[in-house]
Amino acid sequence: HSEESRRRTAENADRMLRSFEDMRAVHDFSFRRAVIFTAHCEGSVQDAYSPLDGDRILCADGGWKFAREAGVKPECVIGDFDSSEEPEGEAIERHPVMKDDTDTMLCVKRALKGGELDFLIVGGFGGRLDHTLANIQTMQYLAERGARAVMDDGITRAETLKEGKTRVSRKKGKLSVFSLTDKCEGVTIRGAKYE
């Protein structure tokens, strides 16, 4: 029952996204990108984040330090501040330590309420395994709602893919493709070592 409900929700989200994409193509308007700085970034913030006009910046807990390193001011710093001090001079949305969502998920939910459909999570890998897995689940949560999600820490980059074509630039490193669901059909890989 739950799996069927989740599938229907994802299908509805896909239809809505296609509708938004059609409207964007016809009316040439763009959606803002929500950029969420997490409290852990294994690599270079500058390699992970290139600013775009109109970026909506949110920070999950200690992610405010990486936002400052990137030279951007967050709309809000969201978290329980169990592992980081609160920043001076920033808008803060404080949550209890004992809660159902991670600080990153709280940022995602705030941005979704604002209508954002394009997400960059800066950091998110490395550090604690439970945080990495929770961030990957957060990307799946976004994909199920029709949003595009990228997580980049300057070393590793993950992106949710949906119907259509995606081109990956040839950079030094490795390419892996995984399904976050039990069924993934119609995927074709061309130009990679293993096709």
Label each region the model flagged:
Residues 51-52, 62-145:
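Acidic/Gly/His-enriched mid-domain segments of enzyme catalytic cores or analogous surface patches
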Residues 17-87:
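N-terminal beta-strand-loop-alpha-helix module at the start
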Residues 36-38, 122-124, 152, 178:
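Short beta-strand segments
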Residues 141-158:
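Short, acidic/small-residue loops that bind anionic groups at enzyme active sites
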Residues 154-156, 161-195:
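Long, charged alpha-helical interface segments
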Residues 47-48, 131-135, 161-164, 189-190:
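A short secondary-structure junction signal
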Residues 2-9:
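A cross-taxon signal for low-complexity, glycine/charged-rich
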